[in-house]
Amino acid sequence: MYGIEYTTVLTFLISIILLNYILKSLTSAMDFIIYRFLLLIVIVSPFVKTQNYGINLPITGSMDTAYANSSQLDTFLTSTLCLYYPAEASTQIGDTEWKNTLSQLFLTKGWPTGSVYFKEYTDIASFSIDPQLYCDYNVVLMKYDSTLKLDMSELADLILNEWLCNPMDITLYYYQQTDEANKWIAMGQSCTIKVCPLNTQTLGIGCTTTNTATFEEVAASEKLVITDVVDGVNHKLDVTTTTCTIRNCRKLGPRENVAIIQVGGSEVLDITADPTTAPQTERMMRINWKKWWQVFYTVVDYINQIVQVMSKRSRSLNSAAFYYRV
């Protein structure tokens, strides 16, 4: 009997010793693999050029200097550029091969053929409804028109910034703006917006909630409207919903893959006076206008300087995406 017990104890001790040996061997092997892997990363990392993207996070910050990233020096090798221009440009040029000519000129600046896209829009009003900013870098040419200064500034505010938006049901609810970053943005073929501010008893202030004719009109027959009312006050709205969609939006910060070039005009449109524009800089510039060929030549000549004050983005903007998450 004692022999059996001794044998059991001996077997148990041998098992422990063997297990200990196996664990030590595995630990040594894993250490060897991990160290080799880390050494490989250290050796290879200087030769790898990558760029990190956040998960649906807004990028904010000053545009005084270019954002440094490991692929910045070779931007044109891995990026796309969209150049938006009014229809009158192609009409004035009158050359069916003008885009091919510009593509060859962009090639001299380091942008391969096929990386630059030319996007035509009819006018500022129609462009504001559906911007479609799909490229890594988007440059919008807007010819100055003194009668459209407000439309131009609203479009600039829309596409140069990121907005987080939600639907509004104006038939059931009252709405209020909480702070300066909170705006109501309407888009459509024809947007007429009227508001009626309410007191704490939900009675109209200077208006009757049951009579829209008494509401204050803040926009009439516009395609893009960014409405700002008194913060902290409930409002009842009347909107031409058959031809217009309105959303409750919050400005998150600058959209840094978009730049606007104002063509002509005595001064550059300024949107930095808005207290929600932070930092107080903008990617807007002006070039003299004589002929559209001269405009495009200037853009080609300075395209790399323009891109250096922008930041490549992985998210696009169109009218549908804008409404929910820009």
UniProtKB/Swiss-Prot annotation:
It is found in: Virion; Host endoplasmic reticulum lumen. InterPro entries: VP7, VP7_1, VP7_2. Glycans are attached at N69. Residues 237-239 are annotated as: LVD motif. Residues 165-167 are annotated as: CNP motif. One of its GO terms (molecular function) is metal ion binding. One of its GO terms (cellular component) is viral outer capsid. Residues 1-50 form the signal peptide. Keywords: Calcium, Capsid protein, Disulfide bond, Glycoprotein, Host endoplasmic reticulum, Host-virus interaction, Metal-binding, Outer capsid protein, Signal, T=13 icosahedral capsid protein, Virion. The keyword Transcription regulation does not apply. It comes from the Viruses. Its main location: virion. Residues 253-255 are annotated as: GPR motif. It holds the Pfam family VP7. N-glycosylated. Ca(2+) 2 binds at Q177, D228, V229, D231, D301. Calcium-binding protein that interacts with rotavirus cell receptors once the initial attachment by VP4 has been achieved. Rotavirus attachment and entry into the host cell probably involves multiple sequential contacts between the outer capsid proteins VP4 and VP7, and the cell receptors. Following entry into the host cell, low intracellular or intravesicular Ca(2+) concentration probably causes the calcium-stabilized VP7 trimers to dissociate from the virion. This step is probably necessary for the membrane-disrupting entry step and the release of VP4, which is locked onto the virion by VP7. Some rotavirus strains are neuraminidase-sensitive and require sialic acid to attach to the cell surface. Some rotavirus strains are integrin-dependent. Some rotavirus strains depend on ganglioside for their entry into the host cell. Hsp70 also seems to be involved in the entry of some strains. Belongs to the rotavirus VP7 family. Homotrimer; disulfide-linked. 2 Ca(2+) ions bound at each subunit interface in the trimer hold the trimer together. Interacts with the intermediate capsid protein VP6. Interacts with the outer capsid protein VP5*. This is Outer capsid glycoprotein VP7. It comes from Rotavirus A (isolate RVA/Human/United States/WI61/1983/G9P1A[8]). The lineage of its organism: Viruses, Riboviria, Orthornavirae, Duplornaviricota, Resentoviricetes.
